[in-house]
């Protein structure tokens, strides 16, 4: 009898009493994989299962992060009511009290110090509608010039390089479906297998079809394993390597003369520059043998088709823009763009890293990828917004420079949405000091993050399960993510929060939207005629078609999967070749007697950005529950460091403590630390404040450090 009862109760615990399905897409990387979350109620508990859904980009694939994304969205530590700091403690309050307090504080600051005493810090993880609205809120609601976003720390070098070279910036110039058919692929500073795993089947298919892979990375990674040739470069020397590759292609007459003559400018200047370079010097500077540099250059040039992919490895440097432009020189002089199976891809890191940089939350930008300093562009947006052109503020400063202005006392108040600069910024100790200096700080987030804890008010935002709007993936394909689950407690859609803030500040007439679709329809008009033209895209089309590449200027336009087939986006329709110095204009830190090792940073598969979301996921956190320092065994031996012991890492900015991980996959002069942890494990406490002069990207990938066993 007892055994039968136990069996009965065990079986009962497996009975599904009810089941709900939520259609959504992954909130993490730029592939934006479509999925369903299945919620099963079993007695008194709930069980969740994520299922990949077939779509044009990833054909139903999910990675480990996507499979477990719901764990942070459903986490009990979610903020579900507005929080107001009273006597140093956060207390739940009504929306009315929170908004009235915000109105009073913002009014006081701007009355005393002017409109530009307030600033806005955005995110590349929010929807296109929210990015658009945040830019409008800064410039119309607050009338401040100070707005930028965390994508400045992620995509700004690649975006600036593409704009300067091609006249337009889109993650991929050609569709992902080209990858399996191309003949040669360069992966420069990208660890796709861990950062965007659902792209890897495209590369694996290319490998099966005989493509030759060249990887450029100071580490051996899951991605470099696919390579036929791995250039294990010294950190920070990517621009010099690009020059060496270009020089060999020119010197050995492997260029596409017809393409250069008809579709580019600047070749003679480029050739004069490369003529002055010494390949032996480049080999020594980069620590890559001349034999391997030549092998890579010749292979890329001689194949009939080829693709170049870059990511943060070469972009997050103080000459990241120049390094990317150097590699784009190679694409252009071989004519490998604007035709099938050839092109360039900047592998976008954040979920909406593409769309978020197109529609106005950047310091120098207006919607549609327009410039805030261009009078025609200003007039167009002012008309859409119903304001006078002169009311539009001018250009502001970059994300890190905003923090410097806060620290200097020029900016008194801050609105921050879905970002964590106390962890993600370089010289993070200065950022934390700056946040403490703010007169007033409002954070809009899911959790009390390492940054939000400094806020005076925290407003509860929506997760990917509850939020609604469009996202633009790595190939420039706009997709629709509809709200499938109600917000918990008193949390609201992010766009609703922005509208409520504008209304509280007396600007509600400019923000009278009733849905994300309302906002998107205005965004379409704002983008009309711009580089990133969404005017022909509608929610109805996205529901029917599953995604549309921009530019899409008409409702019957199919979208543009391949860019630059006949012309580039500069006024003369030609691409610009660039002269790139081997040494950057802003000197990079190099090892010294006091700080004898290079530090470089990056990601691991189970975590995302600063880890605020993934550290809330039990399944993901269990895979990597703490940070680590990857170090070569021979280097470790010189410091008497064994595997999995605590080590202090110091730079001129600060110190952190992490656990050692001995690995022969890294250079002997370099250590690697991932970016996903905070406090005593926050590697960005070590990173310098120097910025790329072209795009204001910090130099995350190169830092001089010393290590001390504990």
Swiss-Prot record:
Its cofactor is [4Fe-4S] cluster; Mo-bis(molybdopterin guanine dinucleotide). One of its GO terms (molecular function) is oxidoreductase activity. NCBIfam families: AssmNtatRedNasC (NF047855). Belongs to the prokaryotic molybdopterin-containing oxidoreductase family. [4Fe-4S] cluster binds at residues 26, 29, 33, 63. GO terms for biological process: denitrification pathway; nitrate assimilation. This is Assimilatory nitrate reductase catalytic subunit. Its EC number is 1.7.-.-. Keywords: 4Fe-4S, Iron, Iron-sulfur, Metal-binding, Molybdenum, Nitrate assimilation, Oxidoreductase. InterPro entries: Asp_de-COase-like_dom_sf, MoPterin_dinucl-bd_dom, Mopterin_OxRdtase, Mopterin_OxRdtase_4Fe-4S_dom, Mopterin_OxRdtase_prok_CS, MopterinOxRdtase_cofactor_BS, Prok_molybdopt-oxidoreductase. Nitrate reductase is a key enzyme involved in the first step of nitrate assimilation in plants, fungi and bacteria. CDD domains: MopB_CT_Fdh-Nap-like, MopB_Nitrate-R-NapA-like. Binds 1 [4Fe-4S] cluster. Pfam families: Molybdop_Fe4S4, Molybdopterin, Molydop_binding. Pathway: Nitrogen metabolism; nitrate reduction (denitrification); dinitrogen from nitrate: step 1/4. Induction: Positively regulated by TnrA under nitrogen-limited conditions. It comes from the Bacteria. Residues 19-77 form the 4Fe-4S Mo/W bis-MGD-type domain. PANTHER family: NADH-QUINONE OXIDOREDUCTASE SUBUNIT G, RESPIRATORY NITRATE REDUCTASE.
């Amino acid at each position: 009898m007892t055994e039968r009862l136990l069996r009965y109760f065990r079986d009962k615990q497996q009975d599904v009493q009810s089941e709900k399905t939520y259609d959504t897409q992954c909130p993490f990387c730029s592939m934006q994989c479509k999925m369903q979350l299945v919620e099963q109620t079993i007695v008194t508990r709930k069980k969740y299962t994520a299922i990949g859904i077939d779509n044009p980009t990833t054909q139903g694939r999910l990675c480990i992060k996507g499979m477990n994304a719901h764990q942070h969205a459903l986490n009990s530590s979610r903020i579900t009511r507005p929080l107001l700091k009273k006597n140093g403690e956060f207390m739940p309050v009504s929306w009315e009290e929170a908004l009235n307090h915000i109105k009073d504080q913002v009014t006081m600051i701007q009355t005393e110090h002017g409109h530009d005493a307030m600033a806005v810090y955005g995110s590349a993880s929010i929807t296109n509608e929210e990015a658009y609205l945040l830019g409008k809120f800064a410039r119309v609601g607050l009338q401040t010039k100070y707005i930028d976003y965390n994508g400045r720390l992620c995509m700004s070098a690649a975006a600036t390089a593409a704009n300067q070279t091609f006249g337009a910036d889109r993650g991929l110039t050609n569709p992902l479906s080209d990858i399996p058919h191309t003949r040669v692929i360069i992966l420069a500073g990208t660890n796709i297998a861990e950062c965007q795993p659902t792209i890897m089947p495209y590369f694996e298919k290319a490998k099966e079809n005989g493509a030759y892979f060249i990887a450029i990375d100071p580490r051996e990674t899951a991605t470099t394993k696919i390579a036929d040739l791995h250039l294990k470069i010294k950190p920070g020397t990517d621009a010099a390597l690009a020059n060496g590759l270009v020089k060999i292609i020119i010197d050995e007459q492997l260029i596409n003369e017809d393409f250069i003559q008809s579709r580019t400018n600047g070749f003679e200047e480029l050739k004069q520059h490369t003529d002055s370079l010494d390949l032996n010097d480049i080999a020594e500077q980069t620590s890559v043998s001349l034999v391997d540099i030549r092998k890579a250059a010749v292979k890329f040039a001689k194949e009939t088709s080829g693709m170049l992919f870059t990511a943060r490895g070469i972009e997050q440097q103080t000459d990241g823009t120049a390094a990317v432009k150097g590699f784009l020189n190679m694409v252009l002089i071989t004519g490998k763009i604007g035709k099938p199976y050839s092109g360039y891809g900047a592998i976008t890191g954040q979920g909406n890293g593409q769309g978020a940089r197109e529609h106005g939350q950047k310091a120098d930008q207006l919607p549609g990828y327009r410039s805030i300093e261009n009078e025609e562009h200003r007039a167009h947006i002012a008309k859409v917004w119903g304001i006078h052109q002169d009311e539009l503020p001018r250009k502001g400063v970059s994300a890190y420079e905003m923090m410097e202005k806060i620290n200097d006392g020029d900016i008194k108040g801050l609105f921050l949405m879905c970002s964590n600069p106390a962890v993600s910024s370089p010289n993070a100790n200065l950022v934390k000091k700056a946040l403490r200096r703010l007169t007033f700080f409002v954070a809009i987030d899911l959790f009390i993050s390492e940054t939000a804890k400094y806020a005076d008010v925290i407003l509860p935002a929506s997760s990917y399960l509850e939020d609604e709007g469009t996202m633009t993936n790595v190939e420039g394909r706009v997709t629709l993510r509809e709200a499938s689950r109600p917000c918990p407690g008193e949390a609201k859609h992010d766009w609703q929060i922005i509208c409520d803030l504008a209304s509280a500040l007396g600007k509600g007439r400019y923000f009278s939207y009733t849905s994300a679709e309302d906002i998107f329809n205005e965004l379409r008009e704002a983008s009309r005629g711009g580089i990133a033209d969404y005017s022909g895209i509608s929610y109805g089309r996205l529901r029917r078609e599953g995604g549309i590449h921009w530019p899409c200027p008409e409702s019957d336009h199919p979208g543009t999967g391949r860019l630059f087939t006949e012309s580039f986006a500069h006024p003369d329709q030609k691409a610009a070749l660039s002269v790139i110095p081997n040494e950057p204009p802003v000197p990079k830190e190099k090892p010294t007697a006091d700080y004898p090792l290079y530090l470089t940073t990056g990601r691991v598969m189970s975590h995302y950005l600063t880890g605020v979301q993934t550290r809330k996921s039990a399944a993901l956190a269990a895979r990597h529950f703490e940070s680590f320092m990857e170090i070569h065994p021979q280097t470790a031996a010189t410091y008497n460091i064994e595997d999995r012991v605590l080590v202090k890492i110091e730079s001129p900015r600060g110190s952190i403590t992490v656990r050692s991980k001995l690995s022969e996959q890294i250079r002997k002069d370099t250590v690697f630390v991932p970016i996903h942890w905070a406090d005593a494990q926050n590697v960005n406490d070590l990173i310098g404040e120097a910025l790329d002069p072209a795009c204001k990207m910090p130099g995350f990938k190169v830092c001089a450090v010393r290590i001390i066993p504990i």
